[in-house]
C-alpha cells in the first residue's frame, strides 16, 4: 500500500512540476533607429560609408545553491537536499565600426526638401527650366544657353533688324523669325484658326474630344448634348440627358429618354408625357395613336397592333383557317386522321380543333376504322384492290388507295418520275438538274453530282472541300486558295505552283500557277507575285531606268536618307554634310567658337558665338561691334543696341530687352496684354484665388464668381434647402416629404421607392431604388421586390437573392424558411410549396412515419394483397405487394422502416454507456484522493530550524538560501542581521519562526504576489528581494510557501539578467558585493540547517510545518 501511495505522490509531483511556468530571458534594447533623410525617385546613387553602431556582449556569473529532489526517504517527506550550480547572465554594450551603404543624389543633381533629386544648372536658367545638368529648356520668346536673351516684340534676326509678320497676337522666334502662335491659331503667320480637332499654340495638340465635342483654348472638352466625361466618350446613361448629362429623366413603364433633350420615348402600348398611361381598348402603338383594324370581332396587341386571330388568319383576321388548322392564327394542326389526303372528308373545328369524322371512321379522334384493313363499304363486304406494299391504307368508306410517298396510281402500282415525289407524286422536286442526278421519292431531297451541294445542288463546294456532296477535304497547303470541287485539284496563290502549291515560281515567271513571263530588262528579275521588276540600288521605275529622287536610296529607292543637314549617296545612303555640320547623319553642329565645313576655323568674337557657316559674330543682348566688345549706350537696348526705350503702361521695363517688369493689377504678359490666368489675380497675378474648385474669380479684386448651385465668399457653400441656380435665387418645387431638391438644376431627387416629377408616386411593380429606375432582378414570375432595397420576395418553393433556386430537400414555403416534418427521404418527399409529405409506396401517416397495414401496399396503401395470402415463398411487401422473398426489392420498405426506428434506440444506448464510464472514472479518482490524504496525515516529520552566521570576508554572497523557502533574501546591513540572531525576539518563537497569528498577518501582506514568481519557485529576482527587505521574519514567512519546486523552474531565474545593466545603476539596485556570485562552497555564507529537539518544538509550529510539507 505504501508503494502505491509513493507512486501516486511521484505522479502528482510531475504534474505539478510540468505546470510550473518558465521564464524566458528578457533583453532590453535601448538603441533607437534614426529617421531617414535619403532621397528617392530617379537619379539616386548608392555610396559606401563608415558609421558607429552598438553590440551587446554577454557576461556569465556562476552561482552555487541548495535544492531539493525527490527520493525514497519517507522521513524527509520524500524530498532530499542537494547542492547545485547555476549561471546568471548580464549584458554590456560595446561600440563598433560598421560599413553602411547610403543613398544620395548623383553628380549634377541636388536634393529637395521633399527628398527628390533635380538637375542643377549653374548659373540658373533665367527664362526657362533646367531639364538636365547644365542644360536649360527656354520659355517661348527666349534663347541662349541660359535663356537670358530675347528680341523685342515684333523683331527677330541679327540685330533684331527684321520685323515679324505674324497675326492674331502671335510673336516670333528671336533667332529664326518663325511665328509662335498663341493658343487656337496655326499657319506660317498664325493666320488660320485651329480646326475642331486641334488646339493649343500652332494647333499641334490633338483635341481628344469625341462625339461632336469641341476643345476650348485650354484643351478642355465641351461636350455636345447627350455626351459626358473628360473626352465626351460616355454616352449619357439611361435616365440622364443634356450637356454633360447633368439632367435626369423621369420616364415610366420602361420608356427610354432622348439623351439630348430629355423627351420620353414611350414603348408601344403607352402614352403620356412620362409614358405613364396604357393604351385604351382598340388602340395601340407608340403614343396609342393608332387604331386596331381587326375583323370578325377579333382584338389586337396594344404594343404592335397585330391582330390576335382565333379561328382566323390574315393581317386583319379576314381569312378562315385552312383544312386541318385551328387556334391562334391557325397555327395549330388538327390531329384527326385522313386530313393529310386531298380526297379525305375529315375536318376539325377552326377554333377548338375538335375532330369531325368522315364516313368509315369513328372515335373522338376519328382514328378508329369501322371495317377491317382489307375491307371497305357500308357493310364492309368489299375487298380493297391496292398494292399492299405501296399503300398506306385503303379508305374504309370508298376503297380508295392512299399511296405511300413515291408511288401513285389507282392501286398505287406506279413509282414517281425523276423530278416528282411525295404522296401520289404530286410534289415537284426543286433540284438544279444540271448539277443533280436524282431526288428522294419520299422527301424530295436532291442527290448532287460531285462538286455541288445545297438544297437544290445549285451551290459549289465550300473552300477546301470537293467530291460528291462535298464530302472530301482538299489537301492543299497554306499557299493554296482551295481546290476544284469535282476532282480536288489545288488552286495555288500567285507566285506558287505544284500539286499542293509547294514550289516557288521558276525564274522569269510570276502570277497564278506561274503562267506569266517577266518583262524586265536583261539581268533584272521580277516579283513572283506581281511581276514588278526588282530594281538594283539607286534605280526605280517599271523598267528600273529612273534614278532615286532626293531623300531616298538603295534597291528600288525604297530606303529614306537620314541626313539632317546634307545629302546622301543614291546607292549607299552615305551623307555629305553642309558647312557647319558633321557626323554620320550631319546632325552635329560645330562647338562654340568654331565654324566652317570641318568646324576647324575659330570665331573672331569676344565672348560671343558666331555663324556656323560664315563665322560672323552673333552679339548677345546689350553688346555691339564687329567683335561684340562694346556695351549699349543709355536709353538703348536689345540686339546690337538698336532698340530705344518707348513710353508704355508698364511700371518698369528690362533695360536689355524692353520687357515689362511690373504689370498693373489683373494683367500679365511681356506687354501686360493678357488677363491673369485662371485662379490668380492682383499685382503680377501673384495672388491665388481663394474660391472653391470649379469657381473663378475677378482678375483685379479676386472676388469669387460662383457657379449655379453655390454661394458664399469662396463659393464653397451649397444653396440652402429650397433654393437653386445662380446666386441661389430660384425657389425649388414642392418635392414630396423625404425627397430633396438638386441645388444646381432644381429637379426633385426622389428617395428609394418613389418616382415622379415631385416624387409623389410609389414605384411601379417590378421597379425599385432612387427614382424607381432600377428593375427588379427576381427571376420569379411575380417580379416582386422591396421598393427601397430591391430585395426579392420569393414565392413558396423558391429561395436565393433572385428567387432562382428551388428549396433544398427538407424545406418549403416562401423563401424556403420552413422545415419539413416528414419522416425522411427513405420514406417520403416534401412538397416545397406547401410542405405536405408525399409518402413513398408502402408508407402512410401525416409524416409518412408508419408502414402500410398488413395485407395492404402501394401509394397511400390503396391496394390489397390476396386475402388468402401470396403463396409459398412469397410475402406481401408494403411497397410492391406480393413478391418472392429472394427478390432484391422484396422487404426493402420494412428494412427502411426498421432502420429509422432502430437509430433512436442505438442513440439512447450510446449515452447510457458514456455516463456509466464517467461515473466509474469519478469513483476511482475519489478513492485515490482519500488514501493520499490519509497517508499524509500519518506522517509526523521534524520541522527544521534555520540559524544565520555572518560571513566575515564574503559580502558578495550574502544571501539566504534554503530549499524549503520560496524566495531569497539579501542582507546589506550586517548589524541588523546580527541583532536578529542575538535573540531580539522577546516572547516569540526562536530562530525567526512566526506564531500562527504572525503568519496569518504576514500572508495578508504578501497576498497577490505573482504565483509564477514566488509560489512555485525557490528563488526570486535580486531586484525584488532588495526591494522587499531582508529581515529574518520575512525569510521565515517565506519558508512556509512552495516546498516542491523543480530545477527546471528555478534555472531560468538564475540566468535572468537585469534590465538596468544597460544604463547607469538604479538607486534601488543591488551592488556587486550583494550579488549571488560565489563559486567556492567552503566559503559559502549561507545559513546552517539543523533539526531541534521535537520535545522543545512549539506544537503549533510543528503542526504548521507538517501541513506545509505536504501542501
Curated annotation (Swiss-Prot):
Highest taxon of the lineage = Eukaryota
Q: Please report, in chain numbering, the residue ranges of the motif NPXY.
A: 962-965
- Occurrences of domain EGF-like (ranges): 118-148, 156-191, 199-233, 241-276, 421-458, 681-716
Location of the EMI domain: 41-113
Q: Where is the composition biased (Low complexity)?
A: 1030-1039
Positions annotated with a glycan in the UniProt record: 66, 333, 345, 456
Q: Extracellular side: which ranges?
A: 19-910
Q: Where in the cell is it found?
A: Cell membrane; Cytoplasmic vesicle, Phagosome membrane
What GO biological process term is on the record, naming one?
A: positive regulation of apoptotic process involved in development
Q: Which residues lie on this side of the membrane: Cytoplasmic?
A: 932-1111
The disulfides recorded in the entry are 45-106, 71-80, 105-117, 121-130, 125-136, 138-147, 160-172, 166-179, 181-190, 203-215, 209-221, 223-232, 245-257, 251-264, 266-275, 425-439, 431-446, 448-457, 685-697, 691-704, 706-715
> Post-translation: what modifications?
Phosphorylation of Tyr-1019, within the YXXL motif, by src-1 is thought to initiate phagosomal formation. 'Lys-48'-linked polyubiquitination by trim-21 leads to proteasomal degradation.
The biased composition feature labelled Polar residues covers: 963-980, 1068-1083
Query: Its quaternary structure?
Result: Interacts (via C-terminus) with ced-6 (via PTB domain). Interacts with nck-1; the interaction is required for ced-1 degradation through the proteasome pathway. Interacts with V-ATPase vha-10.
What protein name applies here? Cell death abnormality protein 1
